[in-house]
A protein has these predicted regions:
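Generic hydrophobic/packing signal
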Residues: 35, 48, 52, 95-97, ...
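Conserved Radical SAM active-site core
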Residues: 61-66, 70-92, 99-169
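Flexible, acidic/Gly-rich N-terminal and inter-domain linker regions that tether
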Residues: 1-83
Length: 169
C-alpha cells in the first residue's frame, strides 16, 4: 500500500494486487522514483508488484524450476554449494537482493540451509574436488556483500589452482 500511495495509484486501479504476498515486496527508493506516477501498468512497477494471479497453480509449472532443492541430484550435500553440472559449482553467498523481482526463480530457495557463515565448508568442498573448474558466486546478489568480504572470498577461490574461472551471477 505504501508503494501504491507513493506512486499516486488510485485504490480502484489496485484490483488484483496481492497485499500480503508470500514473497515480500522489496523496492529501493531510487528504483521507485523511476516508476511513472499513477501508471499501474508501468513496466518497472510490474516487475516488483505482487499480483494475486501469482498464487494460481499452472499445470507443468513447479515451485523449484531449477530443482535446486532436489537432494537426489546432489543438492544440499555441502551447505552453500550447488553442484549440478560437471566441473562447475554455484556458491550461495547471500540470501539478500536489493530488490525482489516477481520473476525470481529462487523465491522459494531454502536459504536457511545455506548460510554465509558456512562458506568455509563450501570452500573446503571446492578445494577437495579438483574436477571443479568454475565457481559461480550467486545468491541473492553477491554484490551486496561488503567489499572486504567478497574480495576475501574471491582471493580464497583464486588460490585453488584447479579453478580457472570465477563468475558473479
Amino acid at each position: 500500500k505504501a508503494l501504491l500511495a507513493y506512486l499516486n495509484i488510485p485504490n480502484e486501479a489496485a484490483n488484483g494486487i496481492d497485499l500480503q504476498p508470500d514473497f515480500a515486496l522489496l523496492v529501493p527508493r531510487g528504483y521507485a522514483q523511476r516508476i511513472e506516477q499513477g501508471n499501474i501498468q508501468d513496466p518497472l512497477l510490474r516487475q516488483v508488484l505482487s499480483l494475486q494471479s501469482e498464487n494460481e497453480r499452472t499445470p507443468g509449472f513447479v515451485v523449484d524450476p531449477l530443482q535446486e532443492g532436489n537432494v537426489e541430484l546432489g543438492y544440499g550435500q555441502t551447505p552453500g554449494l550447488l553442484h549440478k553440472y560437471q566441473g562447475r559449482v554455484l556458491m550461495i553467498t547471500t540470501p539478500a537482493c536489493a530488490i525482489n523481482c516477481r520473476y525470481c526463480f529462487r523465491r522459494h530457495f531454502p536459504y536457511t540451509d545455506h548460510k554465509p557463515k558456512d562458506q568455509h565448508l563450501a570452500l573446503g568442498a571446492i578445494a577437495q574436488d579438483t574436477s571443479i573448474r568454475e565457481v559461480i558466486l550467486s545468491g541473492g546478489d553477491p554484490l551486496l556483500m561488503n567489499d572486504d568480504g567478497i574480495a576475501a572470498l574471491i582471493r580464497d577461490i583464486d588460490e585453488l589452482a584447479h579453478v580457472r574461472r570465477i563468475r558473479i551471477h
